[in-house]
Amino acid sequence: MGKFYEIIKGETPTLVDFHATWCGPCKTLAPIIEQLKTKKGQSLRILKIDVDKNPAIAAQLGIRGVPTLIYYKNGKQLWRKSGVIPLRELETL
């Protein structure tokens, strides 16, 4: 968990994608996240966290459903949303 907090407190804004391998909407969101990664390049870090492999951090952050995306800048949560989010909305982060 220490590494997670180290990453989100870094200079590069971070979008955290909480997902699960069995989750249908997560599979729908995955190519959208890849498109965002391509468009934003080095200006945005994307961190993917499988909630089944990392249940402690998911519980600590109150992740109740997947996919859930959380946007951090300088360690502060600025945006949070669950479900499949359109690329247009993610580009505004």
Where are these regions (language model features)?
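A short beta-strand-turn-helix
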Residues: 1-13, 55
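Short pre-active-site segment immediately N-terminal to redox-active cysteine/selenocysteine motifs
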Residues: 11-12, 19-22, 65
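Hydrophobic beta-strand anchors of alpha/beta hydrolase catalytic cores
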Residues: 15-16, 46, 69
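Structural microenvironment flanking redox-active thiols in thiol-disulfide oxidoreductases
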Residues: 51-58
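Structural micro-motif
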Residues: 61-70
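Non-catalytic, surface beta->alpha helical segment in thiol-disulfide oxidoreductase systems
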Residues: 70-93
